[in-house]
């Protein structure tokens, strides 16, 4: 069954996170972190089937090296609470082949992220399920520096000042005589409307592929509620339950949630059905 998931968060030093570690994790590689003087080794991680760094044409070749790229990002950010990168987690489709999923991810990143001037660290994970009663979870990760790299070959500013003006166009000052201003993004990458556009664009990209393959499956970036579909909500699992389930230890709450998801999937399958990659035919 075709499923939709598209989430984005920020990798933040203020939360004790490091983007070099994040990059090592999604790529399944061993990377040295200059900022902290330590190595992050995820070479034993399984399931990473494709990685690539995509950049605008003006970005120098050195930044296509993963370790170099993310160490530069760590170095240029001076604040102890710096926001380092956007981190995307996007579901791929079991109905499609691995090669089709990879090409979808690459094309989407080029069209929606790189086209906006973003440097993209892409990693595709096959997401093999550990439980026989749960489907595989193929997905891809994207890390993108929050600070832009400019066409003149340097790391640019994240924000700029927009001064508050009066009716005559003069700057308004505060009680201390200082100009009042708002700090705004230089890129617009954090604009909620742009995120909505990315979600919609991914939906269209996947559904276009389904149509090309003569498949009835479709995804929808809208919530089930917005689509008018009533599903049974799952039960909150909490840290301990999730940790046990991750280790392959089945729990009562986990079993209940699996049953709920299975019922919901059966319900949705009445609305969206498609043949497997092996069974479909192409004209």
Model segments located where?
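N-terminal nicking endonuclease/strand-transfer module with a His-rich metal-binding environment
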Residues: 1-274, 278
């Amino acid at each position: 069954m075709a499923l939709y998931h598209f989430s984005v968060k920020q990798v933040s030093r203020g939360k004790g996170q490091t983007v070099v570690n994040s990059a090592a994790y999604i790529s399944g590689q061993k990377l040295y972190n200059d900022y902290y003087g330590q190595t992050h080794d995820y070479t034993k991680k399984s399931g990473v089937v494709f990685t690539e760094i995509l950049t605008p044409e003006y970005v120098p070749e050195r930044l296509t090296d993963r370790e170099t790229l993310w160490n530069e990002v760590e170095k240029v950010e001076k604040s102890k609470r710096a926001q380092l990168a956007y981190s995307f987690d996007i579901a791929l489709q079991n109905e499609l082949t691995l090669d089709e999923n990879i090409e979808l991810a690459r094309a989407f990143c080029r069209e929606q992220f790189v086209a906006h001037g973003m440097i993209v660290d892409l990693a595709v994970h096959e997401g093999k399920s550990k439980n026989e009663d749960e489907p595989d979870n193929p997905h891809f990760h994207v890390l993108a520096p929050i600070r832009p790299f400019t066409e003149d070959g340097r790391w640019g500013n994240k924000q700029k000042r927009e001064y508050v003006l009066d009716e005559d166009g003069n700057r308004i000052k505060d009680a201390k005589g200082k100009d009042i201003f708002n700090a705004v993004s230089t890129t617009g990458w954090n604009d909620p409307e742009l995120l909505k556009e990315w979600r919609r664009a991914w939906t269209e990209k996947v559904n276009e592929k389904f149509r090309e393959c003569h498949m009835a499956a479709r995804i929808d970036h809208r919530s089930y509620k917005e689509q008018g579909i009533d599903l049974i909500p799952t039960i909150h699992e909490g840290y301990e339950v999730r940790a046990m389930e991750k280790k392959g230890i089945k729990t009562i709450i986990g079993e209940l949630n699996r049953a709920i998801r299975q019922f919901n999937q059966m319900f949705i399958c009445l609305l969206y059905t498609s043949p497997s990659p092996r069974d479909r035919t192409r004209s």
